[in-house]
Amino acid sequence: MKESVYYVGLNANNAIKNEDFFAGSFTLYPTQEKGNINFLTDVPKYGDEELFSKYQEFCNNKIDELLEQNPNTKIMCFNKKAKKLCVKFKDNFTKSNDDKLVDTLNNKFEIRELVKDVVPILNYFWIDDLTLSYEEIVQKFNTTTFVVQAVTGAGGTTTYFVNNSKEYDDIKNRTGKFCISAYIKNTPLNVTAIICDDKNIVFPTSAQLILSNNKNFMYVGGDFIYGAKLSDGVKKDIAKYTENILNVVKGLGYRGIIGIDYILTSDNTVMFMEINPRFQASSFLINMELKKLGLPCLAELNYKALNGIEIAENFESVTVDFAFLNCNQNTTFSQFENVDKVTQGYYEKNPTSVYRKIYNYSVLNNDIFEHI
């Protein structure tokens, strides 16, 4: 019987717009997509540990049923927590990257050390001496305004803007070991790529739409239209640095989908920030364009790259002429007129769920977003 691949995770974001590859998906809440098997239809009344345990039992029972129907059912998990949900079926997992390698790539300090010789990096200082004061940091960087990042974190949840000693002390006491750099006015950028044995497939650059919210930098969307309008010199630098970074990561043994974050400064300097060894929040827009062109979706490309299967298609013609913002109600970002919505993965009863408003124009150059 033909192999069928199911996505298993707590969050639907990795699965959406990959329906041409996935036979279905396991998620906490409904996703409105083909073959979705969801656990909840309402907000749970129990804590995180009990929720995980109950969801794990649910997944195990449903996977047993799928295997009875098709012994060639495979499970794709994108992180350790998802793998733990269905560890009973590890022999049915699709091939994935080594967990320790993924941890290394997620570590903001370790990855900067690995790529510092092949790409410009913002001057930073790694702090594990919690006795170091704000005043000493000011002297070291000759500025009073900083960005503080924890060792790991996604979507800006552990990235903070600091410009006084109280904020610095609060974060230091809460975070422990962290990375600190001088704040520079910038436009944050992201590149999605697929690392294969014989080549790297690089997709269009997007500007990241970042809000500074209660001293956090929160990712709320992406703007591919802005990315397409970057100068030829900046595009050339991004292409060169991306290839350099991908080859370093490939040398470590990593294969499949990956995201690279840069910042663009006011003098058009491109600097590396971090790696995201997973699907990006903007992946669904790339998938929509791939589908229009009759090309494989990112989940299929990820699967093939991990399994050493040749990818013969050419992706040089791929462009993404849209921007998007994450929303949880109609009034969110109502100042921008959208042309479409993507509601797959959104479930109204889930308070953390978002849908995407789609725009056919660049929205970055608005004062609410970080940009030069």
Locations of regions flagged by a protein language model:
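Active-site nucleotide/adenylate-binding loops and adjacent lid/helix of ATP-dependent enzymes
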Residues: 104-186, 196-199, 224-247, 372
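Conserved N-proximal alpha/beta basic substrate-recognition cap immediately N-terminal to
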Residues: 36-140, 154
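Peripheral (often C-terminal) accessory segments that flank ATP-dependent C-N-forming ligase machineries
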Residues: 300-372
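A long amphipathic alpha-helix within ATP-dependent nucleotide-binding catalytic cores
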Residues: 221-267, 306-328
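N-terminal basic/disordered segments at the start of proteins
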Residues: 6-27
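ATP-dependent carboxylate/phosphate-activation module, predominantly the ATP-grasp catalytic core
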Residues: 185, 193-248, 276-303
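Phosphate-binding site of ATP-dependent enzymes
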Residues: 160-216, 264-271, 323-330
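Short hydrophobic beta-strand segments
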Residues: 1-12, 73-77
